[in-house]
UniProtKB/Swiss-Prot annotation:
UniProt family annotation: Belongs to the eukaryotic ribosomal protein eL36 family.
Taxonomy, superkingdom: Eukaryota
Keywords assigned by UniProt, alphabetized: Cytoplasm, Ribonucleoprotein, Ribosomal protein
Role summary: Component of the large ribosomal subunit. The ribosome is a large ribonucleoprotein complex responsible for the synthesis of proteins in the cell.
Protein name as it appears in the record: Large ribosomal subunit protein eL36
GO biological process: translation
Main location: cytoplasm
Location(s), subcellular: Cytoplasm, Cytosol; Cytoplasm
Matching PROSITE patterns: RIBOSOMAL_L36E (PS01190)
GO cellular component, one term: ribosome
MF (Gene Ontology): structural constituent of ribosome
Naturally occurring in which organism (per UniProt): Hydrophis hardwickii
Subunit field text: Component of the large ribosomal subunit.
Amino acid sequence: MAIRYPMAVGLNKGHKVTKNVSKPRHCRRRGRLTKHTKFVRDMIREVCGFAPYERRAMELLKVSKDKRALKFIKKRVGTHIRAKRKREELSNVLAAMRKAAAKKD
């Protein structure tokens, strides 16, 4: 693409101005994880553990049945994207457990 020059005609005509950068609107932060929410969720996970379907999905992930685990979780949580997120979360938990076991030995 050609270099843009300030000219009187064409797409770049007119005065040279600096772009007014506005800060993101408050409504854009919906769904973002806060420190407090993360703390509460971690506390609940520590107290309650995993749901039965999550434990079964973790067993499937342990034996490298990733696709089967995804289908199983999708059936339980409803949507493909939520299932992928849940599978990722559970595989991260398994990796952390493996890491902790290796560190302990």
